[in-house]
Amino acid sequence: MQVTEGQLVALQDARFALVAARFNDLIVDRLIDGAADTLRRHGVPEEHLELIRVPGSFELPLAVQRVADAGRADAVIALGAVIRGGTDHHQYVAAECTKGVAQAMMGSGVPVSYGVLTVETVEQAIERAGTKAGNKGAEAALSALEMVDLMRQLEA
């Protein structure tokens, strides 16, 4: 059986867009740093990285869709943090963000890595943004690198 899978390689011409929420910026900024650092460490030139900020995670899908449709990137990395509050609001934001980002990926054919934290507490968010549980932004960047390579293999 022939196996095709993406590798963690940076193709010198690959472009990456990080679309990140400003809400919960103390957390999201760490996710951005983790994603950008990972891409740089894998050889992606600075001029091939673009950061696009949106007000909150609910707005991520539209910006992701526009970036993907415009052909501005070979992969998009969605970054945000949805933290439970005193109401059910976070559930609706998280669900619509997840669904919208997935629809943007499927509709555009451009890989979108999901680095949006959906957590119960600020402490959990901090853990997933670079302390005990690693950096989910960095993990999303690794997924994006692999998917760009895989998409190019599948097109060949």
Curated annotation (Swiss-Prot):
GO terms for biological process: riboflavin biosynthetic process. 5-amino-6-(D-ribitylamino)uracil binds at F23, S57, F58, E59, A81, V82, I83, Y114. One of its GO terms (cellular component) is cytosol. The keyword Kinase does not apply. It catalyses: (2S)-2-hydroxy-3-oxobutyl phosphate + 5-amino-6-(D-ribitylamino)uracil = 6,7-dimethyl-8-(1-D-ribityl)lumazine + phosphate + 2 H2O + H(+). The active site is at H89 (proton donor). Belongs to the DMRL synthase family. Catalyzes the formation of 6,7-dimethyl-8-ribityllumazine by condensation of 5-amino-6-(D-ribitylamino)uracil with 3,4-dihydroxy-2-butanone 4-phosphate. This is the penultimate step in the biosynthesis of riboflavin. This is 6,7-dimethyl-8-ribityllumazine synthase. It comes from Halorhodospira halophila (strain DSM 244 / SL1).
